[in-house]
């Protein structure tokens, strides 16, 4: 079965892709009648060397993404994974020659079709009197024994574009550029690994891998690698790759040693997530520095892909200061990353976090009667939530991911562990603030954030007073914060429904002579009734709002949990 691709037609996909790049980049132009993209300011290159590269499409952003001042002059593209036509290569050479350039360097990846077609175009151009040189780049470090065809051209070719581009921009001559980039090419290596294959538009995947296998040492055309290995962690795979690339018994190894300075390139082969790319980059930095290698520059991104292949390649280039200046030279190429000219190794990568604000001393003695009462309340709340874990999870399965009970139990266990460390603060404001921090760190999910918001806001009115009116104001402040940031309102089938109903009853605490337990009892009953009523509501906020109301036949688990917490508080205060 062929894979799905967002194309207009299989036959025209390479042309459409190149046209799209040029349409969105005013620095590029198409060469009419050919699958060629050129700098739009060719006239500015008079008296300088032009740089042309290319190959099959499907490796984007290579190579057209690297056209620009300080990199390539133009690119000739073939169909997907197919070498470009000789006629188009020759047309590109003629176009840059007519613009007044003093010679053209062809930068070619080491594949038979590319060598033949670029080589033939070069000979035809030279027969016309156009000075043309060609460098063939092979940076593949997969094969331990060199084959007659030589090393394949991989992502390291992009570094050659950069070095050659900087030299050309500086006015260096054609033969000297060719000489220097040939030296640079011998100081680098690339190795790829993939979780699965890719598929050319209109075709099936090029190879199959089982679920527990990855392909090591594969090329950029979907061809199989040198061996298959068992799936492992990112750290383990990176170590294996670097071991292979630097093993001196490997005929295509990179001669990296402790003390070596390198440019490190982590390349997405097309289908890897940015999350995985970051993990691989971190693993590569740690592994190289653990070997005593200095990372002068780190390039992480998609440079040379293989369509949608979910894999990466690692490239190492040995550098000295003169070569590093060429890597750092300015370029306008759209796909080249804007990397700071600063060494990665030796750089301070973290800063000390700001200290927590100093708390005022607890106004009531820790371990006193008020503190003990606080501990009893918290213990009852925790045991209540732990007892409700499975019930809340069952309620949550209808509208969420079935973890509401687990989330509340995680909070309960965190509070229990905290209580083992010593008596809680007797100051209500300090207690709520500490609980807020604890729940934000340990509870997780939206519930942790909402309870954290509620408690942080509720603590503020209690800093100056702890009277019943202050507690009512604390409830108001907590509810306001939940509504402001959670975007829920009463009637939206959330925990706010229970808390809001209780908050309305607690307004009575603001009246002179109000009785704590009488008012709180009414508040708890209202919260429980509101929680039960949520089963008849259509969700207006949270994950449940994306679920059909026909499936919401049970009370909202968050509302049930909030009412249960209030009931637990009341029971302790009544005892």
Swiss-Prot record:
PROSITE patterns: DHAK, DHAL
InterPro entries xrefs: DhaK_ATP (IPR012734), DhaK_dom (IPR004006), DhaL_dom (IPR004007), DhaL_dom_sf (IPR036117), Dihydroxyacetone_Kinase (IPR050861)
Outcome after substituting residue 445 to S: In TKFCD; very severe decrease of triokinase and glycerone kinase activities
Residue positions of the active site: 221
Keywords: ATP-binding, Cataract, Cobalt, FAD, Flavoprotein, Kinase, Lyase, Magnesium, Manganese, Metal-binding, Multifunctional enzyme, Nucleotide-binding, Phosphoprotein, Transferase
Residues noted as binding ATP in the record, renumbered to the chain: 401-404, 446-447, 486, 494-495, 556-558
Domain DhaL: 372-571
Tissues expressing this chain: Detected in erythrocytes (at protein level).
Keyword Phosphoprotein in record: yes
Impact after mutating residue 401 to A: Abolishes both kinase and FMN cyclase activities
Entry superkingdom: Eukaryota
GO molecular function terms noted in the UniProt entry: ATP binding; FAD-AMP lyase (cyclizing) activity; glycerone kinase activity; metal ion binding; triokinase activity
Reported effect, residue 204 to A: Slightly decreases kinase activity. No effect on FMN cyclase activity
Activity modulation: Each activity is inhibited by the substrate(s) of the other.
Binding site for dihydroxyacetone: 56-59, 109, 114
Gene3D superfamilies: 1.25.40.340, Dihydroxyacetone kinase, domain 1, Dihydroxyacetone kinase, domain 2
Residue ranges of every copy of the DhaK domain listed in the record: 9-336
Recorded consequence of changing residue 221 to A: Abolishes kinase activity but not FMN cyclase activity
Function: Catalyzes both the phosphorylation of dihydroxyacetone and of glyceraldehyde, and the splitting of ribonucleoside diphosphate-X compounds among which FAD is the best substrate. Represses IFIH1-mediated cellular antiviral response.
Reported disease: Triokinase and FMN cyclase deficiency syndrome: An autosomal recessive disease characterized by cataracts and developmental delay that may be associated with cerebellar hypoplasia. Additional features may include liver dysfunction, microcytic anemia, and fatal cardiomyopathy with lactic acidosis following a febrile illness.
Identification of the protein by name: Triokinase/FMN cyclase
Organism per entry: Homo sapiens (Human)
Primary gene name: TKFC
């Amino acid at each position: 079965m062929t894979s799905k691709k967002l194309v207009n037609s299989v036959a025209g996909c390479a042309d459409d892709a190149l046209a799209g790049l040029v349409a969105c980049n005013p620095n590029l132009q198409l060469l009419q009648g050919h699958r060629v993209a050129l700098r739009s300011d060719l006239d500015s290159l008079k008296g300088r060397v032009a740089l042309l590269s290319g190959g099959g499409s499907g490796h984007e952003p290579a190579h057209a993404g690297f056209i620009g001042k300080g990199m390539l002059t133009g690119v000739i593209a073939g169909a997907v994974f197919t070498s470009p036509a000789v006629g188009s290569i020759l047309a590109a050479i003629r176009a840059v020659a007519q613009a007044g350039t003093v010679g053209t360097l062809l930068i070619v990846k080491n594949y038979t079709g590319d060598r033949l077609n670029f080589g033939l175009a070069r000979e035809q151009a030279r027969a016309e009197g156009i000075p043309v040189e060609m460098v063939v780049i092979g940076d593949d470090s997969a094969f331990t024994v060199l084959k007659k065809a030589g090393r394949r051209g991989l992502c390291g070719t992009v570094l050659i574009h950069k070095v050659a581009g900087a030299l050309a921009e500086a006015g260096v001559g054609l033969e000297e550029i060719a000489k220097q980039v040939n030296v640079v090419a011998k100081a680098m290596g690339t190795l790829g690994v993939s979780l699965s294959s890719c598929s050319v538009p209109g075709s099936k995947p090029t190879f199959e891998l089982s679920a527990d296998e990855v392909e090591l040492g594969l090329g950029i055309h979907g061809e199989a690698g040198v061996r298959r290995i068992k799936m492992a962690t990112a750290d383990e795979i990176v170590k294996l790759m670097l071991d292979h690339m630097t093993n001196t018994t490997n005929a295509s190894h990179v001669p990296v040693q402790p003390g070596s300075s390198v440019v490190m390139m982590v390349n997405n082969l097309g289908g890897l997530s940015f999350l995985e790319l970051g993990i691989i980059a971190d693993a590569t930095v740690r592994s190289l520095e653990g070997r005593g290698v200095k990372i002068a520059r780190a390039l992480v991104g998609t440079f040379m892909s293989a369509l949608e292949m979910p894999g990466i390649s690692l490239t190492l280039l040995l550098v000295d200061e003169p070569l590093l200046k060429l890597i750092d030279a300015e370029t306008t190429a759209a796909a080249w990353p804007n990397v700071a000219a600063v060494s990665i190794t030796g750089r301070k990568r973290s800063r000390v976090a700001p200290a927590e604000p100093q708390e005022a001393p607890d106004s009531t003695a820790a371990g006193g009667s008020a503190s003990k009462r606080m501990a009893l309340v918290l213990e009852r709340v925790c045991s209540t939530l732990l007892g409700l874990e499975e019930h809340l999870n069952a309620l949550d399965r209808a509208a969420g991911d079935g973890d509401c009970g687990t989330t509340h139990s995680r909070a309960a266990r965190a509070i229990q562990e905290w209580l083992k460390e010593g008596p809680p603060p007797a100051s209500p404001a300090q207690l709520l603030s500490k609980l807020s921090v604890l729940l934000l760190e340990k509870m997780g999910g939206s519930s942790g954030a909402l309870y954290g918001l509620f408690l942080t806001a509720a603590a503020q009115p209690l800093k100056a007073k702890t009277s019943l009116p202050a507690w009512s104001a604390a409830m108001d402040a907590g509810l306001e914060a939940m509504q402001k940031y959670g975007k829920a309102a009463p009637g939206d089938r959330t925990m706010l429904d229970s808390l809001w109903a209780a908050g309305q009853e607690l307004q009575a605490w603001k009246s002179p002579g109000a009785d704590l337990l009488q008012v709180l009892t009414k508040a708890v009953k209202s919260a429980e009734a509101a929680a039960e009523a949520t089963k008849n509501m259509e969700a207006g906020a949270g994950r449940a709002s994306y679920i059909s109301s026909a499936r919401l036949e049970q009370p909202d688990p968050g509302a049930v949990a909030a009412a249960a917490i209030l009931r637990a508080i009341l029971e302790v205060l009544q005892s």
